[in-house]
């Protein structure tokens, strides 16, 4: 091989090797570029997808935000509307209440079809004036009549013209009670009446007979025309029971409305009611719910008005009265005492009322037919002493003696109830820890004689008419002397005699002076042990502001002071 041939071969091989290497590198480069391009594309796709997801999330968030804002706007709009309606409703009520206070309240209109056209019977006219004066004097009755109509008291049932349905219900009684005798002529004449008399004086029939008689006479059995408000559920049920007795077979529908039970059944019954007996709290609830219309009520009764004010129902009473018809309403108020708050309430909502007072009710006094026994003992001996008293007053199942025991608080009542049951006494109880059904059942058992012992707190101290209670035992003295008088008033009712036995301890010594005054006023003996506590009387405290509350006459205008 020549040199030139070898050179050529070398050049050829070098060129071939270089070309292959170059192609290989080129292929690698292309592959690399393709891989990079693919990765780049995947990255772009991934990024684009991620961006799309971000956009979707952002759109979703934005949508949710818009929906949330829309809901908020709707809610704000609804709240604003409700607030406006509530404000308008409140304004209307305030305006109505203001109008009722500023404008005089007119009594029920006297038309020819109404029983308010009262005519004195010939039998009553034939009674001599000396007999009338003797009746008023013997029963310590005073009548304050702004119109000086001088209507005579009805001394017997045959001296008043009532419907046969009412007369038949009264046949089991001998004669009207003093409060009934004096108030009926004014109520049947359509006048506003204030009755101030002790509990158990027949006040329910005093206002119930004219009310039911008027409904029957006018035939107005399609509307709610009579409303009676009472402070407690127990008293409301008692009034209801008495009115049911009057309305039996008369076509008049009576309904009781009170708390502690479902509203639904009460709302259903109200629709066909002519007479409603209610506690203030539940009635205001029904008014606010729009479940009851008082627009046609023309006969309004505030029973135990002083007790309702003591329990803080003044604003509720004003709300209720403002929802009745001022132009046609006849308003009645019955109360055991005549304090300043009750007088102001009467001045605001009654039109020239006739005030009938039985007994000296301006000063707190106890029923003189009640024998009051006060024992000063050690507070740790109460349970032992209670057992002795129950045996003394023959509190066994075979006895007819009904005994009412008062405890101060519901926990004490519950403890004493269990204590008596352990000692084999059959006892019923009414206090705050029991349901309304349990309290009603206990009261029914006591009234029927199924149980001759009833243990109660002060929820039963006012208004309850439990016949034939022979003895009241004050296991723990009440917080006020007024409550003491109301407690012992559960016995000695309707002309009967009774006994009140009180256990007094050193813890109650601040009330010893007031208790001594009550005992002296009723001609009862004052024990020496009670006198040892001294004759001081604790200042009566305001229910909200305490003992240092200054009683200011809010009706007086403020004095304007000018500074030079």
UniProtKB/Swiss-Prot annotation:
PROSITE patterns listed in its UniProt record? DEAD_ATP_HELICASE, HELICASE_ATP_BIND_1, HELICASE_CTER, Q_MOTIF
Example GO molecular function: ATP binding
Q: Where is the composition biased (Basic and acidic residues)?
A: 58-73
Motif residue range(s): DEAD box? 303-306
Query: Its principal location?
Result: nucleus
Q: Which GO terms describe its biological process?
A: endonucleolytic cleavage in ITS1 upstream of 5.8S rRNA from tricistronic rRNA transcript (SSU-rRNA, 5.8S rRNA, LSU-rRNA); rRNA processing
Q: What class of enzyme is it?
A: hydrolase
The record, for SMART domains, names: DEXDc, HELICc
What domain of life?
Answer: Eukaryota
* Region listing for Disordered, in residue ranges: 31-125
Catalyzed reactions per annotation: ATP + H2O = ADP + phosphate + H(+)
Q: Which residues bind ATP?
A: 197-204
Please provide the record's free-text comment about the domains of this protein.
Answer: The Q motif is unique to and characteristic of the DEAD box family of RNA helicases and controls ATP binding and hydrolysis.
- Alphabetical list of PANTHER family matching this protein: ATP-DEPENDENT RNA HELICASE DBP3
Query: What is the protein name for this chain?
Result: ATP-dependent RNA helicase DBP3
The organism's taxonomy opens as: Eukaryota, Fungi, Dikarya, Ascomycota, Saccharomycotina
């Amino acid at each position: 091989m020549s040199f030139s041939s070898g050179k050529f071969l070398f050049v050829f091989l070098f060129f071939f090797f270089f070309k292959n290497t170059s192609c290989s590198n080129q292929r690698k480069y292309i592959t690399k570029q393709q891989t990079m391009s693919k990765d780049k594309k995947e990255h772009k796709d991934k990024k684009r997808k991620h961006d799309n997801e971000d956009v979707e999330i952002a759109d979703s968030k934005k949508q949710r935000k818009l929906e949330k804002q829309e809901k908020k706007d709707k809610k704000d709009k609804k709240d604003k509307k409700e607030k406006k309606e509530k404000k308008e409703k409140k304004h209307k009520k305030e305006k109505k209440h203001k109008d009722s206070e500023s404008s005089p309240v007119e009594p029920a209109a006297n038309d020819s079809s109404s029983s308010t056209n009262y005519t004195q019977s010939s039998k009553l006219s034939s009674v001599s004036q000396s007999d009338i004066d003797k009746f008023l004097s013997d029963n310590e009755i005073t009548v304050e009549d702004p119109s000086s109509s001088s209507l005579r008291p009805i001394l017997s049932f045959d001296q008043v013209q009532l419907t046969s349905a009412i007369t038949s219900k009264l046949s089991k009684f001998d004669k009207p009670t003093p409060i009934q005798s004096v108030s009926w002529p004014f109520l049947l004449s359509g006048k506003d009446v204030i009755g101030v008399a002790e509990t158990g004086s027949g006040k329910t029939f005093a206002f119930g007979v004219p009310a039911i008689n008027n409904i029957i006479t006018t035939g107005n059995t399609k509307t709610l025309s009579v409303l009676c408000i009472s402070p407690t559920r127990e008293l409301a049920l008692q009034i209801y029971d008495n009115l049911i007795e009057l309305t039996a077979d008369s076509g008049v529908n009576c309904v009781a409305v009170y708390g502690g039970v479902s509203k639904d059944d009460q709302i259903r019954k109200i629709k066909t009611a002519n007479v409603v007996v209610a506690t203030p709290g539940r009635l205001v609830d029904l008014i606010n719910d729009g479940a009851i219309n008082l627009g046609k009520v023309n006969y309004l009764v505030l029973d135990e008005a002083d007790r309702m004010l003591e329990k803080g129902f003044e604003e509720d009473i004003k709300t209720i009265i403002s929802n009745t018809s001022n132009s046609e309403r006849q308003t009645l108020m019955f109360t055991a005492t005549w304090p300043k708050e009750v007088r102001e309430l009467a001045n605001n909502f009654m039109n020239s009322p006739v005030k009938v007072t039985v007994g000296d009710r301006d000063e707190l006094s106890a029923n003189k037919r009640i024998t009051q026994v006060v024992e000063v003992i050690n507070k740790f001996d109460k349970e032992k002493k209670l057992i002795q008293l129950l045996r003394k007053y023959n509190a066994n199942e075979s006895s007819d003696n009904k005994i009412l025991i008062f405890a101060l608080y519901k926990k004490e009542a519950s403890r004493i109830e269990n204590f008596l049951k352990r000692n084999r006494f059959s006892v019923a109880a009414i206090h705050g820890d029991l349901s309304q059904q349990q309290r009603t059942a206990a009261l029914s058992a006591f009234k029927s004689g199924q149980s001759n012992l009833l243990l109660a707190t002060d929820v039963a101290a006012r208004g309850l008419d439990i016949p034939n209670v022979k003895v009241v035992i004050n296991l723990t003295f009440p917080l006020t002397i007024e409550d003491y008088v109301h407690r012992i008033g559960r016995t000695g009712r309707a002309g009967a005699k009774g006994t009140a036995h009180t256990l007094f301890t050193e813890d109650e010594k601040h009330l010893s002076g007031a208790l001594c005054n009550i005992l002296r006023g009723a001609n009862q003996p004052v024990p020496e042990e009670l006198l040892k506590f001294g004759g001081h009387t604790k200042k009566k405290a305001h229910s909200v502001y305490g003992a240092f509350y200054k009683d200011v006459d809010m009706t007086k205008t403020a004095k304007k002071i000018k500074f030079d």
